[in-house]
């Protein structure tokens, strides 16, 4: 389709009618339409011989969150500082829309330093986060920013020579906006970096309405972080292709409609996919993209919509509850690598064997640290559930998670079996990546062949060495479990005990109700017998008087 420069609301209205017609026409066969787009993009990638060899290198596999989501070599971001130049990220561009983004995965515990180094080197002005840290009780992204304001609370990344300080925070109904001071320790230069954290993308699905998403897009645009005169904005979810691709597709198409009065949505998607594989993971995400584009043509030119201010909920120091954070990683990481004895595979092997001995399925070797952490914690949850009281009441809660249907909890998502998630597609492609508890784990990387012995046991590697190799230096003399993590553990145990007490109270009340019902039944039976006796007595007395 040709795209000649036009102007005026009439062209935008015509574009809206054209996209609406295509949307309605493809509606009955939407999944086939999505599949055809994917096949076209895959065919073009093969014809152009797009490779992913860097992501498959022996030394880089452990830096990928998902095994099936690898950056193309021709568009990957190359880190300049340090011994590691690889990060799972691509520069995605659409020249005629004057848009460029960096699409990347949610940082792992060992890639936080790489992530911020990329932000610094690429001169990015903003980070757009479209997921929660945990969803469906699975870690989707490591917490990569400081929790509290102040220089003394800054995140220190000495190996990549950067510090990250939280300087401002604003919480809105549908997103959180954070301002960071990113400082280069080599030059002592500092730069302000904004983070737009979209917090109400529903559990494993798509937003019910594009309005909140469009308001978020407007706020991002108004900040100027998408302009060509600044570095590309960093966009991520968990895999960096589903929700991230949705954001980029909607933004690019709306820009093209403003500039040219027309847009071929499927063509734009294929162009974006030529920079990073798999953008828009599901047919539902493509469906939502069309809805957002159609609605955005109208809303982003409506003064009422544009002038409406997003309600500010708070601008206080950020605090997280136990439910909002993943299980503390440092104690787990230490336990995974401390050897039990010479030539031993360490506590990880012991935990894995114990889990398998108790009936849990074995898990594949292609696991990231987050996935391993999920596996061990979930096995602990199973064990706790097995010892719960067997009465026909709800079992003891095994984890302090929020089970409401609200999307407002922006760091922890709840469980929804009926929806499909952008990352679920990649977690369930390979059967040997299945989670032994919930049926899926965000499986990612294969350990190196020379790191696994004949018993499939991974030799111990000091945590300090792991962090130094991946952009994070540990604090000298730091204990495996910090006071903060110990406090979290105690609070979690106290909360667990409180929940257990509540369930026991429920059981006690049920027993009391059962006893009351039984007593009432006995009373009713006794009254029935007494009434029957009285009736019989009256009849006998009446008969006696008549006969007498």
From Swiss-Prot:
The keyword Transmembrane helix applies. It catalyses: O-phospho-L-tyrosyl-[protein] + H2O = L-tyrosyl-[protein] + phosphate. A motif (PXXP motif (SH3-binding) 2) lies at residues 339-342. Residues 33-296 form the Tyrosine-protein phosphatase domain. It comes from the Eukaryota. Pfam families: Y_phosphatase. A motif (PXXP motif (SH3-binding) 3) lies at residues 394-397. The modification Phosphoserine is found at residue 83. A motif (PXXP motif (SH3-binding) 1) lies at residues 327-330. GO terms for cellular component: cytoplasm; cytosol; endomembrane system; membrane; mitochondrial envelope; nucleoplasm; nucleus; perinuclear region of cytoplasm. The active site is at residue 237. Keywords: Cytoplasm, Hydrolase, Membrane, Nucleus, Phosphoprotein, Protein phosphatase, Transmembrane, Transmembrane helix. The modification Phosphotyrosine is found at residue 86. Residues 546-548 are extracellular. The chain crosses the membrane at residues 526-545. Residues 404-428 have a biased composition (Acidic residues). A motif (PXXP motif (SH3-binding) 5) lies at residues 480-483. Non-receptor protein tyrosine phosphatase. Required for maintaining dock/dreadlocks in its non-phosphorylated state. Negative regulator of InR/insulin-like receptor signaling through dephosphorylation of tyrosines when recruited by dock/dreadlocks. Contains 5 Potential PXXP motifs that may mediate interaction with the SH3 domains of dock/dreadlocks. Interacts (via C-terminus) with dock/dreadlocks; this interaction is independent of insulin stimulation and is required for dephosphorylation of the insulin-like receptor InR. Belongs to the protein-tyrosine phosphatase family. Non-receptor class 1 subfamily. This is Tyrosine-protein phosphatase non-receptor type 61F. The lineage of its organism: Eukaryota, Metazoa, Ecdysozoa, Arthropoda, Hexapoda. The gene is Ptp61F.
